[in-house]
Amino acid sequence: MKQNTYSPLVSIIIPVYNGANYMREAIDSALAQTYKNIEIIVVNDGSKDKTETIALSYGDKICYFYKENGGCGSALNYGIKNMKGEYFSWLSHDDLYYPNKIEHQINILNKLDNKDVIVYCGYELIDQKSHSLYFVKPDQRYSKEKLDISLFPLLHSLIHGCTLLIPSILFKKIGLFDESLKYTHDYDLWFKFLRVSSVYFDHEVLIKSRVHDAQTTNTALNQLEEYEALWSGFLKKLTKQEMIMIKGSTHQFLSDIAVFFKKNGYIKSYQLALAMTDKKIIGGFCTFIIKEIIYSLRKYGINTTITKIYTWIRKNRK
């Protein structure tokens, strides 16, 4: 059996804002990793509870930083700027890693020639008391072949940020989280990463994602507006080749994503997708007509072609 020789340093970054209720469980799950070449960075984003007291109780088992409040993206960026690892792994202060999370993903990298791939997986949802609710397994809905298409999982909202193992080099090549985005800083950056990087889906469930009351305090309207801007922005940036890569054709991609937007209440993005679909259809029809005219000119000449066009217009006039 081939021995695992690739054992890079992995930086687990835990951004925290008023997370005293759950952060000890998160830190303990990071410390319990079976893969030992890790550093654990806790970034206190201006908390006003007992976050600092809890973090300091771990001593030199973790790297602890305090900063003024700037949002999750800001705290993650602070950690990234101070990390030493070749790979980045995000752990929310209210979530948990399975003990083999990092080891399992490094084992995957050992089997791959491309060490700059982004690895992701499914996850388990838990409640406030850590009771299991249900499992989210993308491979129950889609084939691995599709889940390994770089932008496919992102544009189907299948990626949980804490499942990812990301090569640190991508932050140097592409940049950090947009700190002006309160709700969508993660998907905004994943989109940039996945346009240039390969992705690998693993069927294992390796994290527990907690659902609790404190997560519902954000203003729903503000969230919706930011997500609308995110999805609409993706549509405007995607190339024809990327749409074809994801769904086989631009028309199929736009049709499917329009359904996704409508189902999730992103009405502005839904309308944009429909408009782009109509534009593609009209554009394709115009291209067809132009080709037919050129063919007719070459075969029959200008006079006959004009007659054919006039006849077609009269026939199709309402």
Swiss-Prot record:
GO MF entry, a single one: hexosyltransferase activity
SUPFAM superfamilies associated with the record: Nucleotide-diphospho-sugar transferases
Gene3D superfamilies linked to this entry: Spore Coat Polysaccharide Biosynthesis Protein SpsA, Chain A
Pfam families: Glycos_transf_2
Keywords attached to this entry: Glycosyltransferase, Transferase
Record bears the keyword Glycosyltransferase: yes
Record keyword Zinc present: no
GO biological process terms on file: biosynthetic process
EC number per UniProt: 2.4.-.-
Family to which the UniProt record says this protein belongs: Belongs to the glycosyltransferase 2 family.
Descriptive protein name: Uncharacterized glycosyltransferase RT0329
Gene source species: Rickettsia typhi (strain ATCC VR-144 / Wilmington)
